[in-house]
Amino acid sequence: MTLESLNALTSSEAMKQFELCCGSSGWVRKMEKNRPFNSIKNLFQKAKSIWFSLSIDDWSEAFLHH
């Protein structure tokens, strides 16, 4: 999927795509709220900063999906 395609998705479609990347519902919601991304670098920076802002419970939720 291109960045442009990701940015053009509806909120629910984008959340489904983010769920494929991470099982934390908090991470998924925050990623969706940070759209649109202006570059791939920006997307990865947001993904990383959101991940490290999550609670231990959010991390546990993500790890349960592995």
Annotated model-derived regions:
Residues M1-T10, K16, C21, G26-H66:
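Aromatic-anchored, charged helix-turn/loop surface patch used as a conserved interaction hotspot
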